[in-house]
């Protein structure tokens, strides 16, 4: 129920009627003059995808009832992301995170589609971003926040989804203050179609700070999302890394 259709005069393109299906799935127009018309779905029922394929109908004699049928596909919304990285690191070493399965798995387009990496700022400093590539041609941008500025700023813009970039994201490249560092960055695509997904895998390179204590651990969180019909569709992935702790020598007990 509640699927809406608009009926247009075929020749003039004028809207002549708007109809809505009842509980039985049937919608009936008011009596229309003889002629040719185009029926277009304008609003799908809840949990179903919109199909704007026009249906041509013709009323050839007075009182004629013209029947048409349309089947909508059930709507499915889902996004995904998976993040992995090193299990164990040493203070001061470089750390790489790998991303897989970044996708809009929905049967419909999503707006404001993004994926984001929230860095464990107490443990790492962002160095480089390998962007990866995606299966649909388009442009996107990368924005970031820092410990001194909670507003998003543009890191790189007008990037192509079909080109793989290695981007310098170090504090010096971005002109950050001496005590400023990136706490999160977001890759923002805008509108993406259903089945939009990564091809080459994105990777993020960070430097582990030198003052971490052996035996501690830190968590990096990535998330992905997009909007359908005013609702956010989201997913999250986390990865835990330990800081290596050298084995303490056993006390000598003999000679």
Where do the model's predicted regions map?
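Solvent-exposed loop/turn and edge beta-strand elements of beta-rich ligand-binding domains
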Residues: 1-255
